[in-house]
């Protein structure tokens, strides 16, 4: 959530920066309500000052019968004040409602652009392999090896669900353990295992609600939401808390399944594992001092890259432009892995800095000094990595002409020494 004071003092700049997202986001409603709020505050404070002054006069009158007119007058004033306070509460709630639907301001370092075509390539790692045959897409490889069963997934549930079998299921489990071991042992993250369902406050804190409710799976009695990413429960671990400056940055790594309705994705990636309603992911979440969040984003991105490097999967790092960053993000790097079976790079991780946007919504703060006023932390998160898409990348990059798939060296200890799926 944006700072109301900042918007009030910089409303034209705020609208200009929001416009770079490519959305129609005018703050006329905010401006009108904010002016009404300030007028109500001014009038209410004037009446409260009058009430205090007259109350002092009444206290000095010994014969209270001579103060009846003033007492009656102050009762009327008190009623007016109560009415104004009630109206002010309604205006504050309306302003809060507006702010909850306004996206974050792009960071000055975010490239300005109109679509994903304006994203900027930062670097590449590895060289796509050359094959003496036409590489197959992962869904063909998985079905031929009997490790991915899309038909059974559809029978059990519906479209965009998959059953993994044998070495396919084992590789998912191996990748989760490999990623968590790397991030906890080498990168300094604390592993947590959060609930896979959260309440409305948690979804609001990270920015999924109120704007993106149609993208979520939810229960109605009680009202819980299946998480679209571990970012939601892990960021909300510290909701409503004041953290110690000495504890920053706080780093968490979490494996969870993720659940997304994929509203608006009809017809996209209908085959394979790229776009599923349920998928596994290892998430990295950080709480940072504001002065260090830019540096922490670079470290977070490097931590996610390390997974791809150890698995020897070619990838590139893209800086997302202002029109392509997520609702809550101020700055984002996407890691895109090379998929020879599809002859393109596809996103496998998104690493973002949110500034104080989520912290303001979730009220996560720290103190610069022991007795100083609390300030909002900066939050960051990124996939480290999307497990299903990593499996996709392994199947396509390590496929052999005979239809088998070689297991990456780094993953073999987690696969019981298995060197090849055939």
From Swiss-Prot:
Keywords, sorted A to Z: Aminoacyl-tRNA synthetase, ATP-binding, Cytoplasm, Ligase, Nucleotide-binding, Protein biosynthesis
Keyword check for Ligase: yes
Domain of life: Bacteria
Any single GO BP term: selenocysteine biosynthetic process
A cellular component term, taken from the record's GO annotations: cytoplasm
UniProt binding sites for L-serine: 229-231, 283, 383
Transmembrane segments: none
Pfam families per record: Seryl_tRNA_N, tRNA-synt_2b
Residues holding ATP: 260-262, 347-350
Catalysed reactions, as listed in the record: tRNA(Ser) + L-serine + ATP = L-seryl-tRNA(Ser) + AMP + diphosphate + H(+); tRNA(Sec) + L-serine + ATP = L-seryl-tRNA(Sec) + AMP + diphosphate + H(+)
The keyword Flavoprotein is annotated on this UniProt entry: no
Gene Ontology molecular functions: ATP binding; serine-tRNA ligase activity
Biochemical pathway: Aminoacyl-tRNA biosynthesis; selenocysteinyl-tRNA(Sec) biosynthesis; L-seryl-tRNA(Sec) from L-serine and tRNA(Sec): step 1/1
Enzyme Commission code(s) on record: 6.1.1.11
Cell location: Cytoplasm
InterPro entries, per database record: aa-tRNA-synt_IIb, aa-tRNA-synth_II, aa-tRNA-synth_II/BPL/LPL, Ser-tRNA-ligase_type_1, Ser-tRNA-synth_1_N, SerRS_1_N_sf, SerRS_core, tRNA-bd_arm
Major place of residence: cytoplasm
Homology family: Belongs to the class-II aminoacyl-tRNA synthetase family. Type-1 seryl-tRNA synthetase subfamily.
NCBIfam families recorded: serS
Function: Catalyzes the attachment of serine to tRNA(Ser). Is also able to aminoacylate tRNA(Sec) with serine, to form the misacylated tRNA L-seryl-tRNA(Sec), which will be further converted into selenocysteinyl-tRNA(Sec).
Subunit structure, as described in the record: Homodimer. The tRNA molecule binds across the dimer.
Domain notes: Consists of two distinct domains, a catalytic core and a N-terminal extension that is involved in tRNA binding.
Protein name from the UniProt record: Serine--tRNA ligase
Organism, scientific name: Pelobacter propionicus (strain DSM 2379 / NBRC 103807 / OttBd1)
Lineage of the organism: Bacteria, Pseudomonadati, Thermodesulfobacteriota, Desulfuromonadia, Desulfuromonadales
